C-alpha cells in the first residue's frame, strides 16, 4: 500500500515538474540560432552609442536565455533585458521577458518596464544588429532604440 502511494506521489510530482518546464526555443534557422548565442554588445541610444553594455545568450537544455544590461556613466540611466527567447528566424527573434529602461529625462527618471511574450528583435537592411521592433516607449512620448549587436 505504501509503495503504491509513493509511486502515485512520484508520478504527480513528475507531471507537475513537466507542466512547469520551459518549452524549447523554436529554431527555424540554425545559422541565426548560432549567431545569437554568446556575448553581444547592447545599447539604448539615450544612454550611449560609445559605451556599450553587454548581453549574454545561453542555451540550457534547448532553451535560449537572454540577459544583459547597459548602464549610463555618472548617472542612474540603464537598459536591462532578461528572459527567454521563444523563436528564432533568419532575421528576427521573439523574446518572452522584460525590457526595463530608465533615463533621467524620460518618464521623470523612473523605470519603464516592457513585460511580455512577443517582444521582437529584428535585423533590417544591412544593419549589424537586432533592434527591438516596439520602439514606442509605453511610459513617455519617445522612441527607444534597443539594439543587440552581432559578435
Language-model segments: which ranges?
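A short, structured loop/turn motif at beta-sheet edges
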Residues: 59-61, 85-94, 121-127
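N-terminal secretory signal peptides
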Residues: 22-84
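Short hydrophobic/aromatic-rich beta-strand segments that constitute the beta-sheet cores
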Residues: 64-68, 93-97, 128-134
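Bacterial N-terminal signal peptides that target proteins for export
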Residues: 1-9
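Short, solvent-exposed aromatic-acidic interface loops
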Residues: 71-72, 98-106, 134-141
Amino acid at each position: 500500500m505504501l509503495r503504491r502511494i509513493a509511486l502515485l506521489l512520484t508520478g504527480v510530482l513528475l507531471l507537475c515538474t513537466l507542466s512547469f518546464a520551459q518549452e524549447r526555443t523554436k529554431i527555424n534557422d540554425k545559422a541565426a540560432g548560432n549567431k545569437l548565442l554568446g556575448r553581444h554588445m547592447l545599447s539604448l541610444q539615450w544612454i550611449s552609442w560609445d559605451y556599450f553594455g553587454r548581453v549574454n545568450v545561453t542555451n540550457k537544455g534547448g532553451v535560449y536565455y537572454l540577459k544583459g544590461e547597459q548602464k549610463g556613466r555618472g548617472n542612474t540611466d540603464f537598459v536591462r533585458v532578461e528572459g527567454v527567447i521563444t523563436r528564432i528566424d533568419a532575421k528576427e527573434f521573439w523574446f518572452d521577458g522584460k525590457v526595463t529602461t530608465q533615463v533621467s529625462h524620460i518618464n521623470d527618471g523612473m523605470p519603464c518596464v516592457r513585460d511580455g511574450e512577443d517582444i521582437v528583435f529584428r535585423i533590417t537592411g544591412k544593419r549589424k544588429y537586432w533592434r527591438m521592433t516596439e520602439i514606442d516607449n509605453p511610459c513617455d512620448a519617445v522612441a527607444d532604440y534597443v539594439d543587440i549587436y552581432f559578435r
